[in-house]
Amino acid sequence: MNSLADTGFIVALIDSQDSHHREVKNIYLQQQKIIVPQSVLAEVAYLLGCNAGISSVIQFLRLLKTSRFELMALTEEDLSRIGDILEEYQDSRVDFVDASVMAMAERLNLTIILTLDRRDFSLYRPQNCTAFTLLP
């Protein structure tokens, strides 16, 4: 089954000291392919660098080549949809990266989001399904 990853999921997977690491690793091993929007990659690199050091960023970048992760660029269609999502949910303070995950999931017709951010993704009503399945 294919899924789409948000930042917190990846950070917890890479950082073995993270309180969600074991649970996230188990979910990761159950996935066939995990789409990673480029916007998520930038946020992951920033957070890993700040919290776990540059060696963790390097580890993640090397892991991308041999892992279940597939890096995907945002399209013009995604950018337009991100703008719509940010406008519709501006009172909820959904951020650009979360909106990019939502938009890409809709475009790819994916319903499983790997995230630790249950608040934003639970609020959102996607166009491609009733609600996203959030793991873990």
Give residue ranges: language-model regions.
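Amphipathic alpha-helical segments within well-ordered protein domains
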Residues: G8, A42-A45, G83
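Alpha-helix/helix-capping structural signal
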Residues: G8-F9, S39, E77, R119
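Histidine- and aromatic-rich ligand-binding microenvironments
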Residues: N2-D6, V36-P37, V94-D95, D117, ...
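Acidic, PIN/NYN-like endoribonuclease modules and their adjacent C-terminal/linker elements
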Residues: L108-P136
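Short active-site oxyanion
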Residues: M1, Q31-I34, R68-E70, R107-I112
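Helix-adjacent hinge/juxtasegments
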Residues: S55-T75
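Active-site neighborhoods of divalent-metal-dependent phosphate/nucleic-acid chemistry enzymes
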Residues: L71-L116
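Short, well-structured N-terminal submotif of metal-dependent ribonuclease cores
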Residues: M1-V36, G49-R62, Q127-N128
